[in-house]
Amino acid sequence: ATERVISEFLKLICGQDAVKILDAYRETIAVIIPEITVMFNFNQNNIHHSYDLWQHTLTALGTIEPNPILRMTMLLHDIGKPSVKTTDNSGQSHFQGHQLESKKIADRILHRLRLPSDFINKTLLLIEYHDVRFNGSKKLMKKVMNVLGTDLTKQLLEVEYADISAQSEYPVSYTHLTLPTKL
């Protein structure tokens, strides 16, 4: 039964109206993944984020291609932010270490949902590395490619683009997503 529910859930998050359905039925989705409730109405309180955490997550999910691993990555990539939130003297929130916290929470979720090992491993790597900023650095690109491999590194760039495009109107440059011309 769990396998059937998850199969249908993966179809849902890859469907054409995934964002609308996930938003409209978020409480129902939370029956399957209760950990997502921390994202509902969570104010990120940062100039780089104009959406609450749930809306940011849905916007990013809707931006990326409908591949189950990529969509699950986007659904869970920031789930650890509420756990690591700090506020500086100016009132801005920061989320240092949220990548590893999100990976830890996602690991529990994905194993509980009994997803295949390869699916879990790729999703967790994408979550862990989703905030790496290459800025054209050959050295960093080689390091990441040694861990992820070429195909997963390409998917990582898609994840980063979707994540950044779902943040805010604050001026941002996508140049850090550019691969070095030669490795």
Model-identified regions with their sequence ranges:
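Glycine- and charge-enriched loop/helix tracts that form the active or gating conduit
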Residues: 1-75, 79-93, 101-115
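Histidine/acidic-rich helix-loop-helix segments that form or flank divalent-metal centers
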Residues: 44-61, 115-171
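Histidine-centered divalent metal-coordination motifs
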Residues: 77, 98, 130, 176
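General alpha-helical segment detector with a strong preference for membrane-spanning helices
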Residues: 81-85, 167, 182
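Short leucine-rich amphipathic alpha-helices used at interfaces
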Residues: 90-91, 96-98, 138, 144
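Conserved small/polar residues in nucleotide/adenosyl-binding loops
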Residues: 175-181
